[in-house]
Amino acid sequence: GLAPSIMNGSDALITDDSAFSAKFYVATSQLMAVNLGDHISGVFWAAFLLFSWTAASIVSGAVIERITTFAFGILAIAIGSVFWTIDAAWGWHFDGWMLKLLGYHDAYASGVIHAIAGGFALGILVVLGPRIGKFTSSGEPRNIGPRNPWLVTIGLFLIYTGFWGFYAACNIPIFNLGPEYGMEGVTYFTATNIYVTPTTLSGITFNFLMSLSGGLLAGYVVSRGDPFWTYSSGLAGVICASAGNDLYHPIQSMIIGMIGVVIAYRMHYWVERKFKIDDAVGAVAVHGYAGFVGLVICGFVLNGYPSSGYSVGAMWDGSTYASINPLG
C-alpha cells in the first residue's frame, strides 16, 4: 500500500505538504480498504504493486551472482517501495510539480520506472564490483554469454507481451464525458492515459509495435546478429520511446527506438571497459541508458506540447501546465 499512498494525487504524502494528508493512509481509511464507493482504486493498487516488482526485477538481473538474498531483499524494498514511487508522485501524476513547473512528460514510464531502476542498479554495481572471471589480468572484459539462448528468447517475448499489457492498462476508458465537457445528453466514448490526455488503444499499440520493431532492427545491426542483444534491444526500443508514445507519430516511435538502442549498446560496452562495470544482463543499458535517452528525446521532439491535459471544463488545453521542453 505504500506506492499508492506516496503518489496518489494532491492528497498524497509526497505531493501534498498538508499535515492532514496522512489521515487518508491509515489502515481504516477508504483508500486502504474495500468500500462500496470504490470503483478503480483496487486496480491501481495492483498496478502500482506490479510496477514495484518491475523496478526490483530490473535490479535483480544486473546484480546476479554477487549478492545475498537478504541484501537484495533490502534493496528491492528500497527501490520498489520508496524511490520509484517518489519519482512517480512528482512526474507521473497530472498534479505532480514536475509536470506543472518543469514540463516533464513520461507517459509510459521511460524514466519513473526504467531509468530510475537502471540508475539504482548502476550504483549497486559500482559497489559490488565485477563477477569473478569477468575481466582478464590485463583488464579486458570477457563475454559471458547466456546459459540458454532459448530461455532468453522466451523470456523477452513474455516481457514484450507484458509491456504491451501495461500500455493497454494505462489506456483508461471514459464513457459519457458529461456536461462539463459540452457533451450533455450525448454518450461519447474516449480514453485517456495517466496524464488525462486523449489516447486510443490502436494508436498506442501501433506506436508500441513500431518502437519494438525499430529496437529489434537496430539491435540486430549494431550487435551483428547477436541473439541476446537483438531481443534485448527490442525492449530497449520500447523503453526509449515510451516517454512520448502517447503523442509520437509511429515513424517517430520507430526512429527514436532505434536511436535509443544504438546509444544504450555503445554505452554498455564503453562503461564496461572504462569503469569495469559488470552489468550481467544489460539491465543498466536496456533500462537505464535507454530510458534516460528517451526522456531527453521526448523533450526535444514534443517541445511546446502541454505536459498534461487535465483541465475540468476544457479537457485537453494544458493551460495550467508547463510545456514539454528539453530541460523538463
List the predicted regions and their residue ranges.
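Glycine- and aromatic-enriched membrane alpha-helices
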Residues: 1-328
